Curated annotation (Swiss-Prot):
<dbReference type="GO" id="GO:0007519">
    <property type="term" value="P:skeletal muscle tissue development"/>
</dbReference>
<dbReference type="GO" id="GO:0043627">
    <property type="term" value="P:response to estrogen"/>
</dbReference>
<feature type="topological domain" description="Cytoplasmic">
    <location>
        <begin position="123"/>
        <end position="132"/>
    </location>
</feature>
<feature type="transmembrane region" description="Helical; Name=3">
    <location>
        <begin position="102"/>
        <end position="122"/>
    </location>
</feature>
<dbReference type="GO" id="GO:0032991">
    <property type="term" value="C:protein-containing complex"/>
</dbReference>
<dbReference type="GO" id="GO:0009410">
    <property type="term" value="P:response to xenobiotic stimulus"/>
</dbReference>
<dbReference type="GO" id="GO:1904880">
    <property type="term" value="P:response to hydrogen sulfide"/>
</dbReference>
<dbReference type="InterPro" id="IPR017871">
    <property type="entry name" value="ABC_transporter-like_CS"/>
</dbReference>
<keyword id="KW-0677">Repeat</keyword>
<feature type="transmembrane region" description="Helical; Name=14">
    <location>
        <begin position="1125"/>
        <end position="1145"/>
    </location>
</feature>
<dbReference type="GO" id="GO:0016887">
    <property type="term" value="F:ATP hydrolysis activity"/>
</dbReference>
<dbReference type="GO" id="GO:0071466">
    <property type="term" value="P:cellular response to xenobiotic stimulus"/>
</dbReference>
<dbReference type="GO" id="GO:0001666">
    <property type="term" value="P:response to hypoxia"/>
</dbReference>
<dbReference type="GO" id="GO:0042311">
    <property type="term" value="P:vasodilation"/>
</dbReference>
<dbReference type="GO" id="GO:0072359">
    <property type="term" value="P:circulatory system development"/>
</dbReference>
<feature type="topological domain" description="Extracellular">
    <location>
        <begin position="1"/>
        <end position="30"/>
    </location>
</feature>
<dbReference type="GO" id="GO:0030017">
    <property type="term" value="C:sarcomere"/>
</dbReference>
């Protein structure tokens, strides 16, 4: 076999004129550096020298970067590209020669291998931080530079120049090798690892030494950054274990909110300084954002420009390849030049295919890099803005919130909406300047291809694009309207769920259900409008390119002198697709730009709003230990009785003989000549001169609205000081100087506000409030506030979460936790603002005695107490009496008795009145009621937890095995069953129509492209000149018209099907819930049910339809593309299998990880928003405690947690898109090579390449939409889980027509051996109860908690399961009656009075059956007639949600009037007087005795004494009727249970 390295000609090996004069030997010389590098590096890499010699042990795989790291990677990639060009040029040149010449491409191949090895070698050296091994690379670059220079000089001597491609390639390689050599020299200079005694040691970045930092994008090498390779571990591991917050770790320092806040704050402060010089100018947030975040946006824009320019390589390469195939130029030349020119090189179809592949890889890499940089910058901006807003909230003037200048809703909008608007605008920013370039370039290329006819198509796009903007504005309007109706529907649904027990007992479910359905119909009407405009938007996106292509090609057919060529046609098609995208995106960018401008205006207004006065603003926080408090020096002759009973008389007090403030300078706070305002300019408090003694109890009293709370806030610095000063004595000296201690240096104050404010945290965290936990102190505080019994009822004790995300507590319980927080804090001063307002007398007394007098005063803490409980004045060491914003009197009680007798007598009168009310209140034990409510909530919560556990077990699909494969199978499985269930909810006809229209539409689109391929191929081959094209033009026009029509049909059917499914699912859900058993509502939290009607319904309404449309469109486009490529070049099917396998695994791994990350993003948003709202609500408390820094830190942590979740989600999306884009590029390369090699039909080649390019755009959308749909189907699954619930059996064995019209007329009740339980699997709550109630008899039922009293009342209405025995009313067994009939004929008054929003008339008679006279009669009986008449509208007067515009007593009387309206002969009162005062109870009892004198009344007693005179008393114990007789007879049995209950309640 002859030698072929230099060719078969022996003269090729001639070295007569010298070795360097032979080009072949020069090429062989170029092999030396590559062989050297491979010989040196391979042993090092295989032995693992670098990794074993690592001097720095860190947990990550990527590490420090040597100097010039990024430049080295860029130069290496450039060198690899040039090597590819050199290989291609050598192969093409060799193909034109008679014999094989390996020297033309073999050195280039070795160079490619060596360069690849160099970057692998460098990466390993860098990760091991062992720079001495870089010496091999330095030698390699030097040798490569020398050999390439020799080669370049040789070419120069031969007379080659820039017109010769090989000369240009060699020149570029000399430059690149020289630059890489310079990079190595720089590393030697900086690291000093050669010829230096003391090498420079470099530690890895600080972030990488933190084990918690898992977001490695800033630290990895350039290749890993571009491909997100470092995400592989997380995404693959998601199959084995769900991704949690621990897995994603912490943010790197540079990305943390505090870092970005500092940058933005400095930039904004600079703008404020500039604006200060111009009175009419406001600081520019835009400029501040540009200064802080401009550089990454410019970098992103650069990436975007490069991506967009590379995007045009696709159409150009398609044109070139199709043209080459059409001309059939791929033949061997007999005569060939020594070297190729660039033009000749690019005329090779295979070269164009490779260039197209590389261009796609680069384009997609740059595009994803642009996306990532903008998203990261947007997240950083959002974090900085949130920190700025939060910092401003902490400095916000209290008057802004209290006077309504700024609402909590506005602040929440700033946090949740405006910052997101700016973030999204930043995401779209690069489009602003990239789009014009893309459009201009597209039009120029189209014009070059098709001439003036291309301008017609461009004009069609430009003219139709504004319609998209119009549609977008209409979509926004429809969405706002939908949101309004949705809010109204949720409000009504919430009312139904809160009052479901009453609705069922009164058989009003269908009335209220109808009301919700009416609102739902309005919402659906708005959703129809939204769906219509969405359909139009989808239609325009699909139809405009078709219309533009039609207009262009028809114009070209008749106006141009030439036939349409395949190269021109398919390149134009590709260009039109590129051109349409920026024009459509323009409307979105403009819309977001307008929103961003508005958001910046709102943000600027907020940041420039009034702040709290500088004299009261604190930079630090801290508390002084008790030991540093100034000790009380007075002599106390007689201790205060801490245990005296709850009766107080002013005349019987003994004043503690402590030194008065007038006699000592031991004063904690002093206000002189104080005038304070809430910002209006008018003084709310005037002429305030007060002193608060240290270590004593100061009480502030006065009428409602006199300024007591305002005085506390003024002292705390929350009000605007118009005049005067507030002095704090916090200097631990024997003679403190007040003039030297201003309020700016005051210490923290433990403050309990009048309105209780709690964190969304555990009970313990609310009480300790950031202070160290001290078990002994904590127990003392909870005992002092009577909290321990309440804590014992909670499922997790004091570790139970309270607030929005936890247990809802009553007002009294919330108040006591707030007071406990103030008591627990280690502060010298305690401010308590009306702490007794929500407490009953027992709790008030206990708190006063144990909490204030014992716990606080024994520690000599200064206590300032605002109260209306004048009976506690006897304990005050100092009293401040206020009236109309001024101090009326100040001093001890003795001083006031002596100096202001009139005031003293007034207090005595008020105390006597309070004492009379106290006699009544002593019987009403509010605490018992609160704890009973809490116990019920806990019972429901535990049951709900049990249900959730059962649901989780069901979700694991019966066959749960604790092994890896099972876990992976469950986590990767798509919920196809749920998808099918959703689709069929929209109706089989619409489902069929959607599938059929979708398939038909894509078939027509394929037919359009195939017709074009046939048309252009036919006329380019058979009719080279001008020919009649009417047939093809007509066919093309018809198909385009059909395609446009089908685009509209498909978009409408998808939206319509989604709307129908949403309508049916909500209708079924509402009916299922409202007809569900009462047990379901007892065991399922209200928030959980409401979530199905809010978040889940919103997903079904608005999110699933567009996702489904996008998924079906992108999937069918990809399938069409694969089908068309396979048809054009069948050999492509061979490569399809491995590509399909790769795609399968990519989507499989991504879907699981994406779902976890999306859930993390959603779950971390709520705590952040809650923290902002709770801070704004508790601003005064936070500032009083001086906990601003702690709350700032918490906000920064929550922001970073949400940001890291969002960043990982974004990185996961980039991970997917890079891989699917690269997969698409591989498809394009495979299709190109297959088309060139196997097809002679240029039209089909163009068609195949066009569809291959389409795949690159839609592959990632298939996976993204699949992942989104999987998450969204979770909402459908949740709704479906409720639809499987069993409803109450509303049917009876009797027909409603068989029930007498006036039944029950007599009111006779017979209870036969009654056994009742709540569910089949639960124990009985009533066992074999037998009783007889005569018509019109008044019956009392009593027993201890849990004895079964309320269960009996529910049994009358069949709200519980009567599994044995029966109840017969007026001769009819109630189990045979239809439920609606039974419940509509009985009346009940519940413990909790429930009113619904609407009118008084609606609340009394929702069925609208009664006349006005009957309603007025009922109101008169309930003693409400005069009050209702005084209201505007009378019977039509407005009732707010929950009846909050009426007192609890009035609401209960309305419930009584409601019961009377029904005219039933049986009335059941279930602890109806438990939550009302004594006066209202007397009214209610009187009405019942008169208005219901001839009716049977069954009273379940809250206070046993109220049923002593009842005609029949039933006493229950543990579900058994133990006593049954008249009250007097039962009292004769001294050891009986009834007697015991009566004695206990006395």
């Amino acid at each position: 076999m002859s030698l072929s390295f230099c060719g078969n000609n022996i003269s090729s090996y001639n070295i007569y004129y010298g070795v360097l004069q032979n080009p072949c030997f020069v090429d062989a010389l170029n092999l030396v550096p590559h062989v050297f590098l491979l010989f040196i590096t391979f042993p090092i890499l295989f032995i693992g020298w670098g990794s074993q010699s690592s001097k720095v042990q860190i947990h990550h795989n990527t590490w420090l970067h040597f100097p010039g790291h990024n430049l080295r990677w860029i130069l290496t990639f450039a060198l690899l590209f040039v090597h590819v060009c050199e290989i291609a040029e050598g192969i093409v040149s060799d193909s034109h020669r008679a014999s094989r010449h390996l020297h033309l491409f073999m050195p280039a191949v070795m160079g490619f291998v060596a360069t690849t090895t160099s970057i692998v070698y460098y990466h390993n050296i860098e990760t091991s931080n062992f720079p001495k091994l870089l010496l091999a690379l330095f030698l390699y670059w030097v040798m490569a530079f020398i050999t390439k220079t020799i080669k370049l000089v040789k070419y120069w001597q031969l007379g080659w120049g820039v017109s010769d491609l090989r000369f240009c390639i060699t020149g570029v390689m000399v430059i690149l090798n020289g630059l890489l050599m310079a990079v190595e020299i720089n590393v030697i200079r900086v690291r000093r690892y050669v010829f230096f005694m003391n090498p420079q040691k470099v530690k890895p970045p600080e972030d990488l030494q933190d084990l918690g930092v898992r977001f490695l994008q800033p630290f990895v090498n350039l290749l890993s950054k571009a491909t997100y390779w470092w995400m592989n571990t997380l995404i693959i591991s998601a199959h084995r274990k769900p991704i949690d917050l621990k897995a994603i770790g912490k943010l790197p320092i540079a990305m943390r909110a505090v870092t970005n806040y500092v940058c933005l704050k400095e930039a904004y402060e600079e703008q404020k300084k500039k604006a200060a010089d111009h009175p009419n100018r406001t600081p520019s947030i835009w400029l501040a954002m540009y200064r802080a975040f401009g550089r990454p946006i410019l970098l992103s824009s650069t990436f975007r420009y490069l991506a967009d320019l590379l995007g045009f390589a696709g159409p150009l390469c398609i044109s070139g390849i199709v043209q080459r195939v059409n001309e059939k130029t791929n033949t061997t030349r007999e005569m060939f030049p020594e070297t190729l020119s660039s033009k000749e090189f690019l005329e090779n179809a295979h070269v164009l295919a490779v260039l197209l592949f590389l261009a796609l890889i680069l384009q997609r890499t740059f595009l994803q890099a642009s996306y990532y940089v903008t998203i990261e910058t947007g997240i950083n901006l959002r974090g900085a803005l949130l920190a700025m807003i939060y910092n401003k909230i902490l400095r916000l003037s209290t008057s802004n919130l209290s006077m309504g200048e700024m609402t909590l809703g506005q602040i929440n909008n700033l946090v949740a909406i405006e910052t997101n608007q700016l973030m999204w605008f930043l995401f779209l920013c690069p489009n602003l300047w990239a789009m014009p370039v893309q459009i201009i370039m597209g039009v120029i290329l189209l014009y070059n291809l098709l001439g003036s006819s291309a301008l017609v198509g461009a004009a069609v796009i430009v003219l139709l694009a504004p319609i998209q903007y119009f549609i977008a504005t209409k979509l926004a309007e429809a969405q706002k309207s939908t949101l309004d109706y949705s809010t109204e529907r949720l409000k009504k649904t919430n009312e139904i769920l809160k009052g479901i027990k009453l609705l069922k007992l009164y058989a009003w479910e269908h009335i209220f259900c109808k009301s919700v359905e009416e609102t739902r119909m309005k919402e659906l009407s708005s959703l129809k409008t939204f769906a219509l405009y969405t359909s139009l938007s989808i239609f325009m996106n699909a139809a405009i390119p078709i219309a533009a292509v039609l207009a262009t090609f028809v114009t070209h057919a008749y106006a141009s002198g030439n036939n349409l060529k395949p190269a021109e046609a398919f390149a134009s098609l590709s260009l039109f697709h590129i051109l349409v995208t920026p024009l459509f995106l323009l409307s979105t960018v403009v819309r977001f730009a307008v929103k961003a401008i508005i958001s910046v205006q709102k943000l600027n207004e907020f940041l420039l709003s009034d702040e709290i006065g500088e004299d009261s603003w604190r930079a630090g926080e801290g508390t002084l230990p008790f030991e540093s408090c100034k000790k009380h020096t007075g002599v106390q002759s007689k201790p205060i009785n801490r245990k005296q009973p709850g009766r107080y008389h002013l005349d019987s007090y003994e004043q503690a003989r402590r030194l008065r403030p007038a006699e000592t300078e031991d004063i904690a706070i002093k206000v002189t000549n104080g005038y304070f305002s809430w910002g209006s300019g008018l003084a709310t408090l005037s002429n305030i001169d007060i002193r608060i003694p240290t270590g004593q109890l100061t009480m502030i009293v006065g009428q409602v609205g006199c300024g007591k709370s305002s005085l506390l806030l003024a002292i705390l610095g929350e009000m605007q000081t118009l005049e005067g000063k507030v002095y704090w004595n916090n200097v631990n000296e024997s003679e403190p100087s007040f003039e030297a201690t201003r309020s700016r240096s005051r210490y923290s104050v433990a403050y309990a506000a009048q309105k209780p404010w709690l964190l969304n945290a555990t009970v313990e965290e609310n009480i300790t409030f950031g202070s160290p936990f001290n078990r002994q102190r904590y127990k003392a505080v909870t005992d002092a506030c009577s909290l321990q019994p309440d804590i014992d009822l909670l499922p997790f004790g004091d570790q139970t979460e309270i607030g929005e995300r936890g247990i809802n507590l009553s007002g009294g319980q919330r108040q006591r936790i707030c007071v406990a927080r103030a008591l627990y804090q280690n502060t010298n001063i305690v401010f308590l603002d009306d702490p007794f307002s929500a407490l009953d007398i027992h709790l008030s007394d206990h708190l006063m005695q144990e909490g204030i007098l014992k716990f606080l005063q024994d520690d000599k803490r200064t206590v300032v107490l605002v109260t209306h409980k004048l009976q506690y004045l006897t304990h005050a060491d100092w009293i401040i009496a206020m009236k109309d914003g001024s101090v009326l009197r100040e001093g001890t009680l003795k001083d006031i008795q002596t100096k202001d007798v009139e005031l003293y007598e007034h207090w005595k009168t008020l105390m006597n009145r309070q004492d009379q009310e106290l006699e009544k209140d002593m019987e009403a034990d509010q605490t018992t009621l609160e704890r009973k409510t809490l116990r019920r909530a806990m019972y429901s919560r535990e049951a709900k937890a049990q249900m959730e556990d059962e649901d989780e077990e069901e979700e694991e699909e019966e066959d749960e095995e604790d092994n890896m494969s099972t876990v992976m199978r469950l986590r990767t499985k798509m919920p196809w069953k749920t998808c099918w269930w959703y689709l069929t909810s929209g109706g089989f006809f619409l489902l069929f129509l959607m599938i059929f229209s979708k398939l038909l539409k894509h078939s027509v689109i394929v037919a359009i492209d195939y017709w074009l391929a046939t048309w252009t191929s036919e006329y380019s081959i058979n009719h080279p000149g001008k020919a009649d094209q009417t047939f093809y033009v007509a066919g093309f026009s018809i198909l385009c018209g059909a395609g446009i029509f089908l685009c509209l049909v498909t978009s409408l059917t998808v939206e319509w099907m989604g709307l129908t499914a949403a309508k049916n699912l909500h209708h079924n859900l509402l009916n299922k819930i409202i007809l569900g058993p009462i047990r379901f509502f007892d065991t399922t939290p209200l928030g959980l049910i409401l979530n199905r009607f809010s978040a889940d319904t919103n997903i079904i309404d608005q999110h699933i339809p567009p996702t489904l449309e996008s998924l079906t469109r992108s999937t069918l486009l990809c399938l069409s593309a694969i089908g068309m490529i396979s048809y054009a070049t069948p050999v492509f099917l061979v490569a399809l299998a491995p590509l399909g396998v790769a795609f399968y695994f990519i989507q499989k791994y991504f879907r699981v990880a994406s779902k976890d990350l999306q859930e993390l993003d959603d779950s971390t948003q709520l705590p952040l928003l809650c923290h902002f709202s709770e801070t704004a609500e508790g601003l005064t408390t936070i500032r009083a405690f001086r906990h601003e820094t702690r709350f700032k830190q918490r906000m920064l942590e929550l922001t970073d947690t949400n940001n890291i979740a969002y960043l990982f989600l974004s990185a996961a999306n980039r991970w997917l898109e890079v891989r699917t884009d690269y997969l698409g590029a591989c498809i394009v390369l495979t299709a190109s090579i297959a088309s060139i090699s196997g097809s002679s039909n240029s039209g089909l080649v163009g068609l195949g390449l066009l569809y291959a390019l389409t795949i690159t755009n839609y592959l990632n959308w298939v996976v993204r939409n699949l992942a989104d749909l999987e998450v969204q189907m979770g909402a459908v699954k949740k709704v479906n889980s409720f639809l499987t619930m069993e409803s109450e059996n509303y049917e009876g064995t009797m027909d409603p027509s068989q029930v007498p019209e006036h039944w029950p007329q007599e009111g006779e009740i017979k209870i036969h051996d009654l056994c009742v339980r709540y569910e089949n699997n639960l124990k009985p709550v009533l066992k074999h109860v037998k009783a007889y109630i005569k018509p019109g008899q008044k019956v009392g039922i009593c027993g201890r908690t849990g004895s079964g009293k309320s269960s009996l009342s529910l049994a009358f209405f069949r709200m519980v399961d009567i599994f044995d025995g029966k109840i017969v009313i007026d001769g009819i067994d109630i189990s045979k009656l239809p439920l609606h009939t039974l419940r509509s004929r009985l009346s009940i008054i519940l413990q909790d009075p429930i009113l619904f929003s609407g009118s008084i008339r609606f609340n009394l008679d929702p069925e609208c059956k009664c006349t006005d006279d009957r309603l007025w009669e009922a109101l008169e009986i309930a003693q409400l007639k005069n009050m209702v008449k005084s209201l505007p509208g009378g019977l039509d007067a407005t009732v707010t949600e929950g009846g909050e515009n009426f007192s609890v007593g009035q609401r209960q009387l309305f419930c009584l009037a409601r019961a009377f309206v029904r005219k039933s002969s049986i009335l059941i009162m279930d602890e109806a007087t438990a939550s009302i005062d004594m006066a209202t109870e007397n009214i209610l009892q009187k009405v019942v005795m008169t208005a219901f004198a001839d009716r049977t009344v069954v009273t379940i007693a809250h206070r046993v004494s109220s049923i002593v005179d009842a005609g029949l008393v039933l006493v229950f114990s543990e579900g058994i009727l133990v006593e049954c007789d008249t009250g007097p007879n039962l009292l004769q049995h001294k050891n009986g249970l009834f007697s015991t209950l009566v004695m206990t309640n006395k």
